């Protein structure tokens, strides 16, 4: 693979791939910058010297995959790049097995005996489950048990002689009913029936229930009260209730418009169970209804308290909200040409999220109203916010061709008349890597410059103030697997060690950190 002129200095980045005689991926080399920028084919003979030079004469600059001797072409061993892994036999090994009646390959058989109980009935018969055993570079073992329908029924992790089992239990329709955590699996390792109120199920397990249409009607997390869901005729979840809401006699509602967009959500203060299964609930914007300007085709939520309202397809909602002329003007678009010109007219705004109103849960009188404006490509370039406590906030941004923020201006107008303005300008290279970022707060600026190595890894950051009164530079280093190994500056430095610790820790080859050493200034 050749990425034409993709390196920071405009050179090609090449990744070599080798295949075995059966056409299977065998070796994948690390990317490397070349001396050309034409995008032409590069052979191994021409790239290998560049690999050695770029990766500090590392010989094993590739990952390697070995396959079993069968038509299934299943991988059995994989080495990542790096001589420490290849020469020390630190690979990821995969074995394909079947379950057994006893030992580490046995799997408990859990059945859903009723809507409110779970039964453990011995173990799965030998040979009825396929088992994939994965051993990582540090010898950590994971066993994944799958039934004949392709469903995972057990994931077992081994910590020495200790088994950490996560069981997945399905009903006759194939729906997930229970997920047993390792603690729950250990507590239910003997045969028996366990009700939903039993300690292992209620306190340590995930429990799911479904209605007659296969929709999740109740979900309970370990140690939590169940969350109940109610659906409409279109299978949309329109009401939900957790344990605290049941105590207060409340439901959370969420209604969508005819296009499936979330329109209004909030609290319905009622202890009775809503019945919406017979109708498709649709929120329609009228501008005068009590639910933030929306009306719905069911009666139950008419007295609901909206907490979040979303508006689409235009800005007519600003005329219908109870806003003063000053506030309405604050939410209108600006004409700052440096940040693009927002489009107007409902035909240009079809399908776009143009505004919102969010009410505080603790203070129902506190409402934040926002209006969003877009350019002719449908990209947001302005947002204006009327915030109950902090005043007004205006955000303008210009974008690159691909939509990355190029220049952003955020102004906050405080209730006491003060105003703060933060302007951020960004520069990108040809591959849209961030090269510099300059932020100016009320005229005082600071710049952060970023540098990259030949394959695009961040290798340096430099901070400087606009008046030159202070500056700071830091560098970052990586290993051959792109894992961060160090960060250094004149005020803080750190080293992350994995496979080659120097302070007596156990070497780690699977990516985990074995040692972290840091220093601040002259100390450590």
Feature-to-residue mapping (PLM):
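Beta-strand elements of repeat-based all-beta scaffolds
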Residues: 1-524
